[in-house]
Swiss-Prot record:
The modification N6-succinyllysine is found at residues 59, 108, 231, 252. Its cofactor is Fe cation; L-ascorbate; ATP; Mg(2+). Ubiquitously expressed in all tissues with significant levels detected in the embryonic and neonatal heart and liver. In the adult, significant levels are detected in the liver, kidney, heart, gut, brain and aorta. Fe cation binds at residues 175, 177, 264. GO terms for cellular component: 9+0 non-motile cilium; mitochondrion; peroxisomal matrix; peroxisome. GO terms for biological process: 2-oxobutyrate catabolic process; 2-oxoglutarate metabolic process; fatty acid alpha-oxidation; isoprenoid metabolic process; methyl-branched fatty acid metabolic process. It comes from Mus musculus. 2-oxoglutarate binds at residues 120, 157, 175-177, 193, 266, 275. This is Phytanoyl-CoA dioxygenase, peroxisomal. Keywords: Dioxygenase, Iron, Metal-binding, Oxidoreductase, Peroxisome, Transit peptide, Vitamin C.
Length: 338
């Protein structure tokens, strides 16, 4: 599908929107676990009943807002994702709709088609090879524990965190992913984030604030960092700096599933290599879109719409909800609302 076809699809979508619409499992605990005898199923708020998660795993996610599944994605799949990423960076393939991003510290350098010039690609829903990640049965098996059976792939990314050149721009500020989405309820949304290599504090692993998914969506904006901030890297403006933090050390193929209200970020990449991970946000198609006007999400909504209008050549006809529905893809079950 080329951009012309994408534009045509968007026009059809906008018209539609104008009408009413009906492996080994290891969880690393960071807080005490309730015993099965003292924890009743009706207390579950963030996980759904099925035979995939153990009681201990459900309790862990309920308490902490994330769950690490070891060795979930195969080496073969990860190598295929890496190879496709490199082809995209070399401009050997140009999937329609894909967004290629560069670190702000590299933005002034002359661009040469190479994976060393790209910090992230996103919106790869039209790239058959990368989108396979969002269709992997081993991923969807766990996603369904949080979203239910009707599953939409909302947003795919492959992150290529570059070595930090001293400006600390490879950091990702602490944030909540729900800031970027107009979908509710938040409990039916989950991110799957898979390490494509060994990841630790040296190359900028994820850091999470356990239990913060139980709070509310906080105001976000660009942090005032001296070295600059990457495009759309909004951060929380008000959080408790004394909150306990957990750094997720992960091996290739390990996958963390986390709630969209969980506060998380990542540190600098202090190595000479590029730290790679692939992720997708999933949501239940039973979710509803909300109007973010007058909320703390207005700032990101403006940015997203401006980028989409520039990309597709539509001025004044799109809103925040349209941009997300346009990119979302059904991966399991039935498409209901979004």
């Amino acid at each position: 599908m080329n951009l012309t076809r994408a534009g045509a699809r968007l026009q059809v979508l906008l018209g539609h929107l104008g009408r009413p619409s009906a492996p080994t499992i290891v969880a690393q605990p960071v807080s005490g676990l309730a015993s099965p005898a003292s924890f009743q199923p009706e207390q579950f708020q963030y996980t759904l009943d099925n035979n995939v998660l153990t009681l201990e795993q459900r309790k862990f996610y309920e308490e902490n807002g994330f769950l690490v599944i070891k060795n979930l994605v195969s080496d073969d799949d990860i190598q295929r994702f890496r190879a496709e990423f490199e082809r995209i960076c070399r401009e050997e393939v140009k999937p329609p709709g894909i967004v290629i991003m560069r670190d702000v510290a590299l933005a002034k350098q002359d661009y040469m088609p190479s994976d060393r010039m790209v910090s992230k690609i996103q919106d790869f829903q039209e790239d058959e090879e990368l989108f396979r990640y969002c269709l992997l049965p081993e991923i969807l098996k766990y996603v369904e524990c949080f979203t239910g059976p009707n599953i939409m792939a909302l947003h795919g990314m492959l992150i290529n965190k570059p070595p930090d050149v001293g400006k600390k721009t490879s950091r990702h500020p602490l944030h909540q992913d729900l800031h970027y989405f107009p979908f509710r309820p938040s409990n039916l949304i989950v991110c799957a984030w898979t390490a494509m290599e060994h990841i630790d504090r040296n190359n900028g692993c994820l850091v999470v604030l356990p239990g913060t998914h139980k709070g509310t969506l906080k105001p976000h904006d660009y942090p005032k960092w001296e070295g600059g901030v990457n495009k759309m890297y909004h951060g929380i403006q008000d959080y408790d700096p004394n909150s306990p933090r957990v750094h997720l050390v992960m091996e290739k193929g390990d996958t963390v599933f986390f709630h969209p209200l969980l506060i998380h970020g990542s540190g600098r990449n202090k190595t000479q290599g590029f730290r790679k991970a692939i992720s997708c946000h999933f949501g239940s198609s039973d979710c509803q879109c909300i109007d973010v006007s007058g909320t703390s999400q207005e700032n990101i909504a403006r940015e997203v719409v401006e980028m989409a209008e520039k990309k597709y050549g539509f001025q004044g006809v799109m809103d925040f909800k349209d941009t997300w529905i346009f990119r979302s893809r059904l991966v399991k079950g039935e498409r209901i609302n979004i």
